[in-house]
Amino acid sequence: DRVEVDAFIRNFSSVFIPKVLGANNNDDFIDSTNTEYVMQRIRRLYLQDSTVTIVLLGNCTHARRYIDWEIKSSLRAGSNLPNGLMGISLPSTNNKVNLPERFESNWVQGHAHCYAKFWNYPTSTRDLQDWIEDAQESRLTRAYLINNSDGMKRYNGKCKKCGETH
């Protein structure tokens, strides 16, 4: 997914400030089983000054533990409001993706009464800007809908698309 993620950043970075967790080989690996420590590190290194988390969804994204960790940290209320949460399918998925469990727990098809929203790949910067603004507004208007009670994934899961563990 790295090529598509890089293209997304290149094409739309005028609309948002990219902070990417897990897309690059040189990203910090948070080697700990201490849930609190992992969430604090993600918050401090990647989310500290962000207000919206965009999950770019490839064919196997749903199986990756780092995605679960980033979503859990994003939804966590603490000294900051939780981040708004939105998902975007990457072009190679043909808009058919399996959502990460924690994302799906915060999403409803049709976007009625849910915290997270899921979108097909944007056709314009205006679309993306509108979606980001909606996700930011959700921090104040829909935070009561957040479902973030499940524990963090300890391991990568088996991909529902290809059957491999990533």
Language model: regions and residue ranges:
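A eukaryotic "domain-to-IDR transition" signal
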Residues: 72-105
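Conserved N-terminal substructure of TIR/SEFIR domains
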Residues: 1-52, 144-166
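Conserved beta-strand segments of the P-loop GTPase G domain that flank and frequently precede/overlap
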Residues: 55-59, 88-89
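Short acidic, S/G/P-rich loop/turn micro-motifs used as interaction or catalytic elements
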Residues: 1-3, 60-63, 93-94
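Conserved TIR/SEFIR loop-to-helix hotspot centered on a Trp-containing motif
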Residues: 59-77
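Structural alpha-beta junctions
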Residues: 13-18, 77-83, 112
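A short acidic (Asp/Glu
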Residues: 5-6, 65-69, 96-99
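C-terminal interaction surface of TIR/SEFIR-family domains
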Residues: 34, 94-166
